[in-house]
């Protein structure tokens, strides 16, 4: 049986890990390289590293931080933020990223997902979908959650799978930073539509939320930031808790 993954997320702004509520009121939660090492040593299955200002300000991801992080991290590292083309993906993989997360560019240039999955393999192409509920549907947002595309998130998820994405990182913008749990309706709708793994993101406040993301949202992996950054729970505590609930994890 496949093990469910626990993934701490490092949102980075100006070279520092930050965690805000709904992408706006950011608080400083430490140095990304040191945080990554703590998580790597602490049993994280993967680490997600997102430069949350890169797309908005149209600047390159901080390659040196990625490189230093990868040297201290001995678990798979997913890196995103400011990825605009195949060359950016190539640079990130060369800096030590195992997977590259693509958000804004996947909407603006869907063919880039086809090209990059052919060139590098679908296993290292993650499409990040930031979605917000509007009536009875969810819409895709880009540029760090600032621009509404009016694109249906469920349809977009299927299109990205068809284009060659190996995984989807699905963030509920309504839940991000709120600590009230994932939007499991959104997660379940996407996971029921595609045959590739989805990572649930946005809203974790306690360990039961991780359980719900897997059981109710049908996610293959659960991502969280605040509960790990501020020491509410360790990765090991999260794994032991999921294990106690009968959810297969790597202990």
From Swiss-Prot:
Active site positions, chain numbering: 11, 130
Pathway of action: Amino-acid biosynthesis; L-histidine biosynthesis; L-histidine from 5-phospho-alpha-D-ribose 1-diphosphate: step 5/9
Catalytic activity annotation: 5-[(5-phospho-1-deoxy-D-ribulos-1-ylimino)methylamino]-1-(5-phospho-beta-D-ribosyl)imidazole-4-carboxamide + L-glutamine = D-erythro-1-(imidazol-4-yl)glycerol 3-phosphate + 5-amino-1-(5-phospho-beta-D-ribosyl)imidazole-4-carboxamide + L-glutamate + H(+)
Location(s), subcellular: Cytoplasm
GO CC entries: cytoplasm
Entry function: IGPS catalyzes the conversion of PRFAR and glutamine to IGP, AICAR and glutamate. The HisF subunit catalyzes the cyclization activity that produces IGP and AICAR from PRFAR using the ammonia provided by the HisH subunit.
Gene name of the encoded protein: hisF
Subunit structure: Heterodimer of HisH and HisF.
Enzyme Commission designation: 4.3.2.10
Chief location bin: cytoplasm
Molecular functions (GO terms): imidazoleglycerol-phosphate synthase activity; lyase activity
InterPro entries recorded: Aldolase_TIM, His_biosynth, HisF, IGPS_HisA/HisF, RibuloseP-bd_barrel
Family that this chain belongs to: Belongs to the HisA/HisF family.
Pfam family, one: His_biosynth
Protein's organism: Pelagibacter ubique (strain HTCC1062)
HAMAP family: HisF
Biological process terms in GO annotation: L-histidine biosynthetic process
The name this protein goes by in its record: Imidazole glycerol phosphate synthase subunit HisF
């Amino acid at each position: 049986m496949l093990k469910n993954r626990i993934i701490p997320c490092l949102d980075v702004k100006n070279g520092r890990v930050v965690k805000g509520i709904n992408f706006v009121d950011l608080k400083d939660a430490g140095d990304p390289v040191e945080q990554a090492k703590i998580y790597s040593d602490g049993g994280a299955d993967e680490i997600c590293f997102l430069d949350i200002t890169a797309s908005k300000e149209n600047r390159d991801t901080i390659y040196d931080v990625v490189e230093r992080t990868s040297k201290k991290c001995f678990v798979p590292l997913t890196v995103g933020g400011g990825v605009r083309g195949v060359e950016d993906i190539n640079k990130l993989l060369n800096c030590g990223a195992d997977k590259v997360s693509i958000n804004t560019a996947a909407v603006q240039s869907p063919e880039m997902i086809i090209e990059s999955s052919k060139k590098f393999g679908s296993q290292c192409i993650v499409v990040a979908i930031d979605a917000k509920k509007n009536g009875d549907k969810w819409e895709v947002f880009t540029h760090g959650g600032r621009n509404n595309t009016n694109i249906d998130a469920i349809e977009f998820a299927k299109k990205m799978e068809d284009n060659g994405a190996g995984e989807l990182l699905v963030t509920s913008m309504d839940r991000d930073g709120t600590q009230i749990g994932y939007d499991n309706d959104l997660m379940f709708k996407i996971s029921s539509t595609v045959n590739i793994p989805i990572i649930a993101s946005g809203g974790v406040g306690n360990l039961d939320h991780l359980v719900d993301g897997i059981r109710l949202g049908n996610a293959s992996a659960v991502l969280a930031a605040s509960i790990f950054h501020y020491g509410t729970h360790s990765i090991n505590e999260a794994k032991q808790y999921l294990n106690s609930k009968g959810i297969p994890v790597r202990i």
